Amino acid sequence: MKIQNVNAIEILDSRGNPTVEVNLKLEDGTISRAMVPSGASTGEREATELRDGDKKRYGGKGVLKAVENVNSAIAKAIENKHFTNQRELDYFLIELDETNNKSKLGANAILGVSMAFARAKAQSSRTPLYQYLGGSNAHIMPVPCMNVINGGKHADNTIDFQEFMIAPHNAPSFRESIRMGEEVFHALKAVLKLKGLSTGVGDEGGFAPDLKSNEQAVEMILEGITKAGYKPSVDVSICLDPASSEMWENGKYKFFKSTQKLVSSDEMVKLWESWVNQYPIVLLEDGMAENDWEGWKNLTDVIGNKIEIVGDDLFCTNKSILLNGINKGVANSILIKLNQIGTVTETLETIELAYKNSYNCFVSHRSGETVDSFIADLTVGINAGHLKSGSGCRGERIEKFNQLMRIENELGKSAQFAGLKAFKNAK
């Protein structure tokens, strides 16, 4: 199938920062659109997001260069050209870029084209996007890990750790799981309000109160779960993403928003061990900094048989980095973010490697999101069993949940909700 036309424009993401939108048309008249997300806390090894750097325009965050790369170099190379499948297009774009991190054309330009082509091919063949991405066996509906309290780089408050999530797993379906999550979210709001704390929300829709400690965030959530009529651990568990790379300073971890305390790698592992023993935690993402490989190995050895340990900044959805982690026995799950690697094909290849080595895949949005629901289809396509797409509010987050409800409805009786078994080692 030939690509007849491809073009891009600059649009805005959920934080009001520019991002890339790509529109693509196939020769049979199929038209598709894709919008590229952007992260706040990014891994050092992520593919390059091309920004203009013109401080007079959007504070240097414009993406006109990336847009121009789609409209000129990429369009010239792929228009009126036949691509048999996704892999053929994506590797053509990788070769066109000529760098190992997509810094010439920009991962935001390349990914926009890659996603738009995937959506167009699915539409053209009258196949749901989740089946185009994962095949006819795509049927597992995920547990939504909802980011109900924000800290770190995602909020201007006193909490060091970036994301405190709830996982409503004791449900018969995704739709009911979302209902449980929303009820806890609203109950938590009432708890915070009663204590005179802020109910303003952060970038991902979670509350961003000023609390006395990171532990207090967990205590508040447990109170919200109970207030909503559910039992912690039995019905709803907790997932964490402290984004520890943001705390890494000269070989130590600095609690830069609360106590200003510096702790060693070993002390950080002990902290997580005590939290896992004390609270109903089923998943810990980026519990250690991306460059603290020794700490990661220690963490995996200590609690890797108790909970799911996810590498985000550590792996950056990169196949070769993941392989290094597998060989070192580090983590037992990988976070999947399309824009960390920059093409649909490379994302799927990383997922395949993870599954072959018994690692879980945890699909994720970015803090700078759009209303594109591609990751909802990806999650079902690869039968990931869990995803994080923000909190119980903000349209760009809810759109992923709405798409998942549509998919569940479409799958009918073949849809199967993952439940607690979505999480590695969960009991």
UniProtKB/Swiss-Prot annotation:
Belongs to the enolase family. Pathway: Carbohydrate degradation; glycolysis; pyruvate from D-glyceraldehyde 3-phosphate: step 4/5. Its EC number is 4.2.1.11. Disulfide bonds: none annotated. (2R)-2-phosphoglycerate binds at Q162, K337, R366, S367, K388. Its main location: cytoplasm. It holds the Pfam family Enolase_C. It catalyses: (2R)-2-phosphoglycerate = phosphoenolpyruvate + H2O. Mg(2+) binds at D241, E285, D312. Catalyzes the reversible conversion of 2-phosphoglycerate (2-PG) into phosphoenolpyruvate (PEP). It is essential for the degradation of carbohydrates via glycolysis. This is Enolase 1. One of its GO terms (cellular component) is cell surface. It is found in: Cytoplasm; Secreted; Cell surface. HAMAP family: Enolase. It comes from Chlorobaculum tepidum (strain ATCC 49652 / DSM 12025 / NBRC 103806 / TLS) (Chlorobium tepidum). GO terms for molecular function: magnesium ion binding; phosphopyruvate hydratase activity.
